Each structure stands twice: as C-alpha cells, then as structure tokens.
C-alpha cells in the first residue's frame, strides 16, 4: 500500500488537533526504536484503505511511505482510535531495513472451510488463534499464513505446527498451541 505523507510540526497538542480538523492523522515513523520523522497521513485515504482490508491483515501490511522525495517501507506498529467515533487519531510506523529482522503478527487464514469433513457432519469450526507472532527479515514478510482445514473431522483440532511456515520466518508463538477446532454443535 502506497501512502503520500507530509512532514508536520511537533510540540503542542494544538498542532495535532489542527491536523485532525484538517483531515489528517498525525503519525511518527520509528527506526531502530528512535523517532525518524513526524508525519501526517490523509485520514480519508487511510480510512478507505482500512475499510477494504481483510480483518487482522493490518499487522502484516507493508506500507510504502512517500516522504520528501524518498520511499520508506514501514509497518504499522500502533494505531490509536478516538473512543466514541472509532476514528484513527494517531499512527506509529516502524521502518523496515533490509538486513534487520522485525517482529510482527501474521494472520492465519483457514482455507477449504466449506469442504471441512467435520463441518459437513454437522460440526462447528472455531478458529482459536487468529495470528502468529513471528520474526523475519522484511523481504520474507507474507500477508497471511494458510491452514488447510479440509481433512479436520468432528472433535478434532489442528495446531500451529500444521501450518506450512515459509522459509525465512521464525515463529515466536509456540507451535504446540491449538489453532482451530471442530466441535459438535
């Protein structure tokens, strides 16, 4: 996802309030734990992007931030919402550097759920874990991990170890954890 961002002033809360009133979202880009740039993201563009995004996929979405003539590859590390309207009021991005590993959550997508044996026999498929915490280099980031549930029968489970993890990705979440279960209704 490409975002055109602009530089912003730092300091008082009144600056941030003015940015929000003008249709922007204040944001900070961090690199190696230190603030790299204070920026503004267009609120309408970001809101439209979020509305089209699959649930849980924001954590593994790589953004290309067009900032002062250069492109910064980054992940959203924190997002703050307004309590009553649920509008985004602040973003934290983490810059991706080629040789520096990054920790992130990659969502799990269950495939072939319609063909699941346990569901066809009247069971209910429940996804226990929605994302896996991993560490990998930026070039190895994938948007989601697939778990094939076609062969899962009634009263059976699949663990994280049943997910095919691509090369270059190391899991932090223990692989013995149950990812999905099919139970009787």
Swiss-Prot record:
A Pfam family recorded for this sequence: Ribosomal_TL5_C
MF GO annotations: 5S rRNA binding; structural constituent of ribosome
UniProt keyword list: Ribonucleoprotein, Ribosomal protein, RNA-binding, rRNA-binding
SUPFAM superfamilies the record matches: Ribosomal protein L25-like (SSF50715)
HAMAP family: Ribosomal_bL25_CTC (MF_01334)
Similarity remark: Belongs to the bacterial ribosomal protein bL25 family. CTC subfamily.
Protein name listed in UniProt: Large ribosomal subunit protein bL25
The organism of origin for this protein: Chlamydia pneumoniae (Chlamydophila pneumoniae)
Gene: rplY
